[in-house]
Structure formats: C-alpha cells, structure tokens
C-alpha cells in the first residue's frame, strides 16, 4: 500500500474517531462537511452526462435534513418527502424546462447524499440520555473522563463505533486478502474487486460484529452480532459498487482528488452511505423485540 495512501488513511481515521467521540454538533458539522463535499463530487459526475440538476437547492435541503436529524431526529423522515417536493417545485419554475434526468438525479442526490448520511447523526445520538461518566462540552459535546471504562460511554457512541469497526474490518479484509488470494473478478463494475477478497471482508465484518455484540451484551449476542456483521459487510460492499457504477457511467476513475492516494470524498465514504440506516433500524427495531423475548 503506497505511503501516501497509508498517511491519508491514518489521519482520516484519527479525525473521524475524534469527532465521533465528541458527538453533538461537532459530529454533525463533520457529517455536514462530508455531505457538502460529497454532493459537489456527485453533481460534477451528473453534469458530465449533460444533465442540469438542482445542485445548490439539493445541497441546502440536504443540510437542512441533517439539521433536523440533530435537533428533531423524530421528524427527519417526515421532512424527507417535503424536501423532495421542494426540489421538484424549484425545477418546475426554471426558465428551461427540466428533464426527467434533471429531476431524478436531483432527488437521488437528496436521498444518497443527504437523507441516508443523516442516519449517522441519529445513530450517534442514540436515546439522547445524558451520561454522567464523562465531560459534557459546549454544543452537546462529550469526552470520556476515563478510557478505562468504555462501558460507561453513551450507547449511541458504542453502537456507532461498532458500525465503523465492521466497515473498517470489511474494507481492510477485502483489500489485503483480495491482493493476496484474489483470483475471481466480482463484477465488471469494479474490476479490481474479487470474490475471494469480498468474502474475507464480509467475514471480518461478521467477526467484529460478534465481538461487539458480546461486549455490548446484546440479547442472543452470537446471532445478533453475526447478523449485523454479515449485513454490514454485504451492504458496505454494495455501497462501494453503487458508487463505482455511477463513476463508470460518468466516465471517471475517481469521484474527485481531494484525499491523496484515495480519490474523492465519495470514494472513501461509499461504504458508509447505506450502512447507517441499516444499523439504525437494526438497533431501534430488532434489538428491542429480542429483548422482550
């Protein structure tokens, strides 16, 4: 792995982990920056196809969805169709009549680049309970008083760390084992991905999921942890392939050049987009049911 790529990865993980721990508006601001930069790259690819989306309007409304996820998370799902309607209304009154492609790419940008990432904020927020075992900073920030007792960290933080760890395990496992053992191409969409590497990546995510469920004392932790790890491994891979499909259609190798050795923001966050709602509803809907059995 090139030195530049390693340095970028280490810096990125350190920043992401620090902001993840801080939570509150610090984490929301970080996600807002990712949404803004990611949508810029997305709309550059869209324009490369000769399409004229409502880029600025979609960016603003995507950030408003994130604001809702931070302040009123229970209303974010209700705001989503309203913001979609506003995009349609905006395009309706433009001097040049909008095409189906203009409308659909704008709505996809809202969904892919704004609504889905907002689930990371909701997941990190957790149940919103105040945890006394840490320093409570301005802007709803949190910092542990002691690193020796992570069991006292906010539940939302622990679950989000677990989700990140599963994604990292899947990415690292697929990259290393794919380089070593990869023989069978997985898909023409992403020629460098192999079946062998992907299976090892999913296996790494599954293992981390089981360990995390055991640590968090989830009900039936062997099953719930394996299921979550398996789903994250698969969905993060599908997220990667989805972004690769968009890049191939736009005729570009990378979504951008922002991160040395890695490409653009979308190239680094594609595995996270679909994972956030998966983990959120797994924790919010499935675990409470199992707790009552």
Curated annotation (Swiss-Prot):
EC number of this enzyme: 2.7.7.41
Catalytic activity, as annotated: a 1,2-diacyl-sn-glycero-3-phosphate + CTP + H(+) = a CDP-1,2-diacyl-sn-glycerol + diphosphate
GO biological process: CDP-diacylglycerol biosynthetic process
Annotated membrane topology: Multi-pass membrane protein
InterPro entries found in the cross-reference section: PC_trans
Annotated keywords: Cell membrane, Lipid biosynthesis, Lipid metabolism, Membrane, Nucleotidyltransferase, Phospholipid biosynthesis, Phospholipid metabolism, Transferase, Transmembrane, Transmembrane helix
Membership in a protein family: Belongs to the CDS family.
Protein name: Phosphatidate cytidylyltransferase
Species of provenance: Synechocystis sp. (strain ATCC 27184 / PCC 6803 / Kazusa)
């Amino acid at each position: 792995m090139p030195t530049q790529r390693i340095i970028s990865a280490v810096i990125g993980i350190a920043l992401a982990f620090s902001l993840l721990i801080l939570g509150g508006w610090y984490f929301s601001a970080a996600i807002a920056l990712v949404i803004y930069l990611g949508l810029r790259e997305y709309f550059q690819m869209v324009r490369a196809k000769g399409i004229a989306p409502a880029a600025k309007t979609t960016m603003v409304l995507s950030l408003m969805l994130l604001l809702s996820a931070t302040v009123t998370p229970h209303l974010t799902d209700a705001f989503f169709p309203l913001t979609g309607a506003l995009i349609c209304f905006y395009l309706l009154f433009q001097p040049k009549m909008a095409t189906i492609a203009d409308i659909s790419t704008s709505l996809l940008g809202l969904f892919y680049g704004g609504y889905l990432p907002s689930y990371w904020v909701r997941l990190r927020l957790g149940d919103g309970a105040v945890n006394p075992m840490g320093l409570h900073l301005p802007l709803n920030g949190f910092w542990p008083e002691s690193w020796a007792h992570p069991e006292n960290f906010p539940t939302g933080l622990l679950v989000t760390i677990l989700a990140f760890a599963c994604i990292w395990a899947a990415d690292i496992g697929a990259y290393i084992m794919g380089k070593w053992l990869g023989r069978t191409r997985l898909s023409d969409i992403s020629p460098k991905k192999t079946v062998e590497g992907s299976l090892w990546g999913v296996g790494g995510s599954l293992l981390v999921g089981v360990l995390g469920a055991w640590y968090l004392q989830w009900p039936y932790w062997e099953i719930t942890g394996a299921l979550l790890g398996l789903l994250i491994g698969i969905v993060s891979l599908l997220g990667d392939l989805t972004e690769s499909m968009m890049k191939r259609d736009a005729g570009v190798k990378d979504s951008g050049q922002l991160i040395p050795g890695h490409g653009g923001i979308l190239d680094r966050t594609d595995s996270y987009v679909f994972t956030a709602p998966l983990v959120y509803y797994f924790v919010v809907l499935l675990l409470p049911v199992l707790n009552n059995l």
